[in-house]
């Protein structure tokens, strides 16, 4: 077999690379490397003329290996693979050398050093390219069903979009009702629409949709499999009420003598020991709180449908689906961590979500904002922004995006209820980023007279007798220290990843970002996809966002998983672990390292050997790195390919020194 003929193509990327690297000098160096038949430069290799240049060179010089020195392969590798395929050679005979992010961007101002590094990187790429192999593809069937985990507005929207396309959808939520956080809100900014008025129709549509099956009060326990064939195990918690016969009439709750704090109202109101979380709950089914139930039997006595089941047990469900969407939402920041604000200590320090429940007409105070200490309407309220956001001390350096608008909305609603009330907002920056949001901000100032103080309060003091509060803050615009007497202080608590997000991410096999939210495959080009084919993410589970962005991303996630389900098949490139059975010693180190449970063992010729599941394997290479005998290799990244690349880099360094 003749030696491979390599072509090297260096991209200027406008001035991104050529501004820091002498691309022409790099081309000249590459043309002298062993095995290189042609080297060329072009301002934008990813553009049609650049692609044409590569195709023409393949045909003219009979090239069978291509090295592209350009930007990150995450963006343009598929483009260049398509170029090779169009030219009649395997798309896997491409070696992509990232001389932008790995060189030009980190060595700006050092043209000589950056050029030298680019030469070394390309030399390594050429040696690896010579040893590249074709990669087979495997086709798997995709079950035309999807499980949507989380039934807030994101999960509901994804489920409806998929159901309307004819796909079977399992909409799963751990709570008693679907609706999520949006169900707790009073109104939505900037239009001040009633939140439940626009959410409830979607909740009902999801419940009545012929292609959507609601599974509420259930938790994910295990997920196995791969795109097209995910096996999901759930535990459906007992309601102690038969779902098929309960009519939701409420007679049981009326008879129940026990009242406990209502979690849905954040403890501001009460519920019975047999309850629905809120009046518009879907499904409208009652649940017995066994922790507080005194087993008096009154609920069973008054139930005309005889739906009470005191002996109900948890139920395990096993469901097979082709794809998964994760839309599990968020947790509100625990404001007790900001001890200087006295949340949980001072009665009249509350959070924005608690205000939402107060001003909700169906909430515990029937739409009236009150002081928890005495039930009176506050005459002066202070909102404090960025509580648990943009704060490295509590580990949340990010902006939660919606807190400013929450405060603006609630401040205006409070002024509508009582025009004589005073409302202050202490802020560092007001981030009115969305459509109509800046106008909403101006309305709060000009029409409602909300007062804005640029500064983060240092601390809050309480008068133990009146329960009134004093907020101490520096107005950084005026250069003054202010002490504001307030009846009520509202903390704009930030949005955090769900506490169980790590456990779910592990079951799904997907990554999380440094803030704990689920990590997308690419922040710009694949914002709803994950590293696991067939699993998409949507809503605040991916990162803080408002309702319009959440709905848009939910629709995007539905579209992403609908593609393989519509086709009914999915092609998987077999960049997967392979086993040399003659060398494998059956030590099981690789199985311990595999995060995807893709490695099992079989006995052959009297000893154990590793067996890899080509579909479950994701090609991470952890097993190959750990294998003490070298029996485990990663196709397309075999030892000889990686070592060849290292040798090429070292040899180039010697050449450049001579």
Curated annotation (Swiss-Prot):
Binding residues annotated for [4Fe-4S] cluster 4, in chain numbering: 594, 617, 620, 623
Pathway in which the depicted protein is active: Cofactor metabolism; coenzyme M-coenzyme B heterodisulfide reduction; coenzyme B and coenzyme M from coenzyme M-coenzyme B heterodisulfide: step 1/1
Pfam families assigned to the protein according to its UniProt record, in alphabetical order: Fer4, Fer4_7, NAD_binding_8
Positions bound to [4Fe-4S] cluster 3: 584, 587, 590, 627
InterPro entries, per the entry: 4Fe4S_Fe-S-bd, 4Fe4S_Fe_S_CS, FAD/NAD-bd_sf, HdrA-like
Residues covered by the 4Fe-4S ferredoxin-type domain: 236-267, 284-313, 575-604, 607-637
Any one GO BP annotation for this protein: methanogenesis
Gene Ontology MF: a single term: 4 iron, 4 sulfur cluster binding
EC number: 1.8.98.5, 1.8.98.6
Enzyme class: oxidoreductase
Keyword line: 4Fe-4S, FAD, Flavoprotein, Iron, Iron-sulfur, Metal-binding, Methanogenesis, Oxidoreductase, Repeat, Selenocysteine
Residues given in the record as [4Fe-4S] cluster 2 binding sites: 256, 293, 296, 299
SUPFAM superfamilies, per database record: 4Fe-4S ferredoxins, FAD/NAD(P)-binding domain
Note describing how the cofactor binds: Binds 4 [4Fe-4S] clusters per subunit.
Cofactor(s) for this UniProt protein: [4Fe-4S] cluster; FAD
Reactions this protein catalyses: coenzyme B + coenzyme M + 2 reduced [2Fe-2S]-[ferredoxin] + 2 H(+) = coenzyme M-coenzyme B heterodisulfide + 2 H2 + 2 oxidized [2Fe-2S]-[ferredoxin]; coenzyme B + coenzyme M + 2 reduced [2Fe-2S]-[ferredoxin] + 2 CO2 = coenzyme M-coenzyme B heterodisulfide + 2 formate + 2 oxidized [2Fe-2S]-[ferredoxin]
Residues noted as binding FAD in the record, renumbered to the chain: 150-173
Membership in a protein family: Belongs to the HdrA family.
Function of the molecule: Part of a complex that catalyzes the reversible reduction of CoM-S-S-CoB to the thiol-coenzymes H-S-CoM (coenzyme M) and H-S-CoB (coenzyme B).
Record note on quaternary structure: The heterodisulfide reductase is composed of three subunits; HdrA, HdrB and HdrC. B1 and B2 subunits are interchangeable, as are the C1 and C2 subunits. The heterodisulfide reductase forms a supercomplex with formylmethanofuran dehydrogenase (Fwd), F(420)-non-reducing hydrogenase (Vhu) and formate dehydrogenase (Fdh).
Name of this chain's protein: H(2)/formate:CoB-CoM heterodisulfide,ferredoxin reductase subunit A
Designated gene of the protein: hdrA
